Amino acid sequence: MSAGPGWEPCTKRPRWGAAGTSAPTASDSRSFPGRQRRVLDPKDAPVQFRVPPSSPACVSGRAGPHRGNATSFVFKQKTITTWMDTKGPKTAESESKENNNTRIDSMMSSVQKDNFYPHKVEKLENVPQLNLDKSPTEKSSQYLNQQQTASVCKWQNEGKHAEQLLASEPPAGTPLPKQLSNANIGQSPHTDDHSDTDHEEDRDNQQFLTPIKLANTKPTVGDGQARSNCKCSGSRQSVKDCTGCQQEEVDVLPESPLSDVGAEDIGTGPKNDNKLTGQESSLGDSPPFEKESEPESPMDVDNSKNSCQDSEADEETSPVFDEQDDRSSQTANKLSSCQAREADGDLRKRYLTKGSEVRLHFQFEGENNAGTSDLNAKPSGNSSSLNVECRSSKQHGKRDSKITDHFMRISKSEDRRKEQCEVRHQRTERKIPKYIPPNLPPEKKWLGTPIEEMRKMPRCGIHLPSLRPSASHTVTVRVDLLRAGEVPKPFPTHYKDLWDNKHVKMPCSEQNLYPVEDENGERTAGSRWELIQTALLNKFTRPQNLKDAILKYNVAYSKKWDFTALVDFWDKVLEEAEAQHLYQSILPDMVKIALCLPNICTQPIPLLKQKMNHSVTMSQEQIASLLANAFFCTFPRRNAKMKSEYSSYPDINFNRLFEGRSSRKPEKLKTLFCYFRRVTEKKPTGLVTFTRQSLEDFPEWERCEKPLTRLHVTYEGTIEGNGRGMLQVDFANRFVGGGVTGAGLVQEEIRFLINPELIVSRLFTEVLDHNECLIITGTEQYSEYTGYAETYRWARSHEDGSEKDDWQRRCTEIVAIDALHFRRYLDQFVPEKVRRELNKAYCGFLRPGVPSENLSAVATGNWGCGAFGGDARLKALIQILAAAAAERDVVYFTFGDSELMRDIYSMHTFLTERKLDVGKVYKLLLRYYNEECRNCSTPGPDIKLYPFIYHAVESSAETTDMPGQKAGT
C-alpha cells in the first residue's frame, strides 16, 4: 500500500543463514541498525505493493489526501505528518504520484480481498490464530491476527523509509520497552522462508520503536490541533477515544505499591525493603497499597518510594481524567459523521456477509480491557473503519496513547457485544442538556450552614458514665484515683506479664530472651531487657553511639538497618547547641522513660484484632514510655516481614525513620523530638482511648429514607485546625498510620506526627477490614507545621487548649477510615465499590445508641482522592450520604479548591431542595454507572457525575406532577 510521496516500498530481505546468503558483517546495517547506510532515492525504488487484503483503507472510494500523511506514533514520537511538512509543499508530480498509488492500492486491495474471503474464511475459522498459511495473500492477513499495533502493520511496507527517516534525524536513544514488543512475534510456527523473512523484518522494524508512556507524556498544542482536525470522530464517544488518552496519568507508589506498604523511600539509602503491599481487598483492589495512607487532594503528592507501610502519597501518582468539552466533540462529530457512516456501511457488507469479523482491543496503560470497541457495531470515531487499515496510525497513533491491538475473530458472543456497542453508539449520540446551578458569589470562602451552628464536643455530648474496665474495655490506670491535673496511676501496681498471641509482647517481658555467650563461649538464652538497659544507659555524644546501642540488641539487623537520616540530622541539620541539648538532655530523658516501662505499663495491652469491638484506655505517660521504646527499637517480633507473627500489624519500631537521605526525615525527627522534649520535661496528665469498631449490619442503601443533613463547605482551613470538637477524619491506610515511621508525609502521617500519641495505635491495631474503623479520643497536639509532603516543615511547639471530658480525655475525636485505591478511574463507580465506600464511611461515623443531637459534626475532606485515584465529587457525595445515614452534619474542607467547594454546595442544595433522601441519591449513583460507565470504552465517561444527576432529577421532575418524587428511580 502506498503511503504517499516520498515513501519507498518494502522489498524482500533474504533470510540470514539461508542458502546463498551469509550473516551480515559488522558494517551491515541489518545487524547494526544504529549505523547509517546508503539509501536509494525513493523515486528510483521499484514499485511493489503489499496491502493487507482486509484493510479498510483498500475499500474503493476511501483513498484521499490523508493517506499520504498518516500519523504514526512510533517514529521517535514525531508524527509523520510533521516530518513531511518540513519537506515543503507538495509538487504537482508528487500529488500525481500519490493519486496514482492510491488508485492502484484500491484496485489491488479489492482484487485481493475478493479472492481472499471466498477461499479462506473456512480456514480462518478452523485454524488457530497464529497458524496461518503463508501465501502472499494470507500473509497480509496475518497482521490482523497477531497482536501488532496499527503502525507495525504499516511498517511492513515502509521499513526502508523508516530507516531513511531515522538516518536523516538522529534517534533519541530511548530503548525499546518490552511492553511495546509483540509477544507473538517469533512464537508462531513458520514453514517457509517468506515467513521467516517477514518476522526478521518485524524484529528489525521494532528497533525503530520509541516507547510511549501515557503516564508522563503531555500533548503539545500542535498535536492537539492536529488531532482535532482529523476526521476520525463520528460521535462524542469517538472524540473521547481520540482525546481520552491525553489525560495525564501518574504512577503511584501508595505510600505505596511497594509500600511503605510497598513504597520504599527513593532516598532511603543503600537498602530497599521493597515489600509488596496488600491494599488489595476482598473486592480485588490493588496490592500495592497495603500499608500506606493517602494524601489530601489537591495538595502535592509524595513521590518517594517506601517500603512497608507508607502513605498513599508515595505512590507517585494517581490517574486523573479531565472532563472533555462537549462542544468540541460535537463539532468533530459533524465533520466526520458522513464519512464514518459511509465507510462503515461498506465495511459491514464485506465483513458481515463474508463471516470474518475483526475486533480491535484498545488497552490504555493502567487499564484492563477498559476500552474495547467492535468494528461492526460502532461506526464512529477511532474504532470505526480504522481497525486494520494502516491509515489508523494517524488516528490511533497519538503520542499520548499506548495502544495494544489484539486482532482476533469475534467469538460466539458477538451478538451480545454488538448489542452493547449499538446501545453505546446511541448513547453517545444523545445530547444531555446541562443544568446550570445558580451563580454563587466568587468571593465567598465558605458556603452552607455557618460552622458556629454545627454541633461540637463537649457541649453536644452526653454525660459519660464512670470509667470502668469491662470485657470490651481495657483500662490500664487506677480509675478510682483519677483526678484532673494529676498523672494517672498505673493499674495494677506491679508489672503483670502475658506472652501470648492476644497481647502485645513487651520488651521488658521475662520471655523476651536473647542468645548470649557466657565466659566459656557457650551460647545461652539471656534476658534481652537487661541487654537493652545496658546498651541504652551508655552516654551518647555522637550519633554513632546511639546507632551502636540500638544494634547491640538487634544484632540480626546490624548489616540491614541504615542510620543515614539520623546521622545527617545530628551532624548537618542541628546547630551545635541544639545537638548538645539533644544528647545531654532529651535523649537521656527518653532513655529514662523508656526503661521505666515495667513500672509505668504494668498491665498487658490487648491486641485489637479484626472482628473485635474493643477499647483500650491508657494514660499519656504510658503512651510516652511505649513510644520511647519504639524510638529505641526495643519491641520484639516486630521487625520481621512477610508471614511473621505481626505481619498483619503496622511497623512500630522507628528503624525505618532513621534510614535514607530524604529531605522529609529531618522534619519528621524535629516534630518527634519536640514531642519527647515536652513529655519528658512535664508529664502529661490525660487519658487516651483507642476503639476498634467492627460493624455487621449496614443500611440497605436503596431503601434508606433518611434525609440529607446540614453541610458547611469551605476551601480554607484544615480538619485539625478548624474542626475542633468534631469527629475528625483520618484519611487512613488499612495499616493505621501509613508511612509515619517511614517516608510517608501526607494527611495521615502529618496528623500522626503532630499528635504523636496516635502512633502507639500501630503497636496493637491489626490491619483494618472493610467493615472496620479505629476511633481515637483524647490525643494532644504538640506541634504546628507548614507545607505538605515534600514541603512539610516543622514550625513550632503547640499548646493544645482543647477541653477535657469527664474521663480526662481531650475532646479530640479522630476516626481512621481507609478508602479503596482505584487504578482505573471507572472502577470507583461500580456499585460494589460505591457500597464498600459507603459502608466504610458509615462505620466511621456511626455511634450505636447515641442520639443524633449528641453527635458532633463530621470534619472531613477529599478522602480517598489524590494518589488513591478517587473522584473528589463522588467521594464528597458518598460521605454526605454516609453522614446522613448516621444522622451527623458534615463540615467539608476542600483544601484550597474553591471550584470544588461551589460544586459540592450546589449539589447538596439541589438535592435537599428537591427532598431527595439517601436511597434516591444512591439509586442515581447506580443509574450513572449503568448508563454512563458500564459500557464506557474510554478512560472516563462522557458525562460527569454531577451534570448527570442534575439532568436525571430534572427530567424526572418534568414527568411527574410532584417534582422530585420519582427522582432517582
Swiss-Prot record:
Composition bias type Basic and acidic residues, residue spans: 87-100, 116-125, 190-205
Span list, region A-domain: 1-449
Phosphothreonine sites (modified residues): T137, T197
GO CC annotations, alphabetized: cytosol; nucleus
Reaction(s) catalysed (UniProt annotation): [(1''->2')-ADP-alpha-D-ribose](n) + H2O = [(1''->2')-ADP-alpha-D-ribose](n-1) + ADP-D-ribose
Modified residues (N6-acetyllysine): K334
E.C. code: 3.2.1.143
Modified residue annotations for Phosphoserine: S135, S195, S256, S259, S281, S286, S293, S297, S311
UniProt entry keywords in alphabetical sequence: Acetylation, DNA damage, Hydrolase, Nucleus, Phosphoprotein
Short sequence motif Nuclear localization signal: positions: 10-16
InterPro entries, per database record: PARG_cat_C, PARG_helical, Poly_GlycHdrlase
Comp. bias (Polar residues): 69-84, 101-113, 128-149, 179-189, 226-237, 275-284, 329-339, 369-387
Zinc as UniProt keyword: no
Lineage: superkingdom: Eukaryota
Subcellular location(s) per record: Nucleus
GO molecular function: poly(ADP-ribose) glycohydrolase activity
Compositional bias segments (type: Acidic residues): 311-325
Function: Poly(ADP-ribose) glycohydrolase that degrades poly(ADP-ribose) by hydrolyzing the ribose-ribose bonds present in poly(ADP-ribose). PARG acts both as an endo- and exoglycosidase, releasing poly(ADP-ribose) of different length as well as ADP-ribose monomers. It is however unable to cleave the ester bond between the terminal ADP-ribose and ADP-ribosylated residues, leaving proteins that are mono-ADP-ribosylated. Poly(ADP-ribose) is synthesized after DNA damage is only present transiently and is rapidly degraded by PARG.
Self-association and partners: Interacts with PCNA. Interacts with NUDT5.
Domain notes: The PIP-box mediates interaction with PCNA and localization to replication foci.
Name under which the protein is recorded: Poly(ADP-ribose) glycohydrolase
Organism: Mus musculus (Mouse)
Gene name tied to this protein: Parg
